UniProtKB/Swiss-Prot annotation:
<keyword id="KW-0963">Cytoplasm</keyword>
<feature type="site" description="Important for substrate specificity">
    <location>
        <position position="15"/>
    </location>
</feature>
<comment type="function">
    <text>Nucleoside triphosphate pyrophosphatase that hydrolyzes 7-methyl-GTP (m(7)GTP). May have a dual role in cell division arrest and in preventing the incorporation of modified nucleotides into cellular nucleic acids.</text>
</comment>
<dbReference type="InterPro" id="IPR003697">
    <property type="entry name" value="Maf-like"/>
</dbReference>
<feature type="active site" description="Proton acceptor">
    <location>
        <position position="72"/>
    </location>
</feature>
<dbReference type="GO" id="GO:0005737">
    <property type="term" value="C:cytoplasm"/>
</dbReference>
<dbReference type="Pfam" id="PF02545">
    <property type="entry name" value="Maf"/>
</dbReference>
<dbReference type="InterPro" id="IPR029001">
    <property type="entry name" value="ITPase-like_fam"/>
</dbReference>
<protein>
    <recommendedName>
        <fullName>7-methyl-GTP pyrophosphatase</fullName>
        <ecNumber>3.6.1.-</ecNumber>
    </recommendedName>
</protein>
<dbReference type="GO" id="GO:0009117">
    <property type="term" value="P:nucleotide metabolic process"/>
</dbReference>
<feature type="site" description="Important for substrate specificity">
    <location>
        <position position="158"/>
    </location>
</feature>
<keyword id="KW-0378">Hydrolase</keyword>
<keyword id="KW-0546">Nucleotide metabolism</keyword>
<dbReference type="GO" id="GO:0047429">
    <property type="term" value="F:nucleoside triphosphate diphosphatase activity"/>
</dbReference>
<feature type="site" description="Important for substrate specificity">
    <location>
        <position position="73"/>
    </location>
</feature>
<comment type="similarity">
    <text>Belongs to the Maf family. YceF subfamily.</text>
</comment>
Length: 196
């Protein structure tokens, strides 16, 4: 494949690691050390891109001479940003609120070449329309898909979360999982990495 610089995925997300593994190229995952608190007045796409860039930049000291991938996703609905519920009670409340609503997911990916300083950036917008949900269906879903509490809006689309979704509009179906793979492949090619 001719990969000269090591490839590092800056994430603690098991879902993003799985997405990278499916590409079949050698990489190392490393947890970034970066404050992910949204800034006041920041739009969802701005937050996603700032966090993706920050994650990549936070790893430059540990991985000089590398290609570093940073990614983040921010959901937007009802005039505010939504994150990961992180526990069952929050997931139940979140899914009840989002029932029947349209959610915009902004998935940002960056590729930083630490040798040249060049950074490739992209934000992918995915629109998800949730089905009308009741408490019983939400409880059953969360019992069968416990990892959903670690997903944005508790909607694990690559698993049983697909049952909660009425419609998805996207140019890259991978972006909703957390990593816009189509654009990442382009970025890697631009840096001399052929994934095939």
């Amino acid at each position: 494949m001719g990969l000269e610089l090591p490839l590092v995925l800056g994430t603690s997300s098991v879902f993003r690691r799985e997405q990278m593994e499916r590409l079949g190229i050698a990489f190392q995952a490393a947890s970034p050390d970066f404050d992910e608190t949204p800034m006041l007045g920041e739009s969802a796409p701005q937050t996603a891109l700032r966090l993706a860039e920050g994650k990549a930049r936070s790893l430059t000291g540990r991985f000089p001479g590398a290609l570093i991938v940073g990614a983040d996703q921010v959901a937007w609905c009802d005039g505010r940003q939504w994150g990961k519920p992180m526990n069952l009670a929050n997931a139940q409340k979140m899914l009840m609120h989002l029932s029947g609503r349209e959610i915009e997911f902004y998935s940002a990916v960056v590729l930083l070449n630490t040798v040249t300083g060049r950074m490739h950036r992209h934000i992918d917008k995915t629109v998800v329309v949730m089905r009308q949900l009741d408490e019983l269906h939400i409880l059953r879903y969360l019992e069968r898909e416990p990892d959903a509490v670690y997903c944005s809006c508790a909607a694990k689309s690559e698993g049983l979360g697909a049952l909660l979704i009425e419609r998805i509009e996207s140019t890259d179906p991978n972006a909703l999982i957390g990593l816009p793979v189509f654009r990442l492949v382009d970025f890697l090619k631009n840096e001399g990495v052929d994934v095939l």
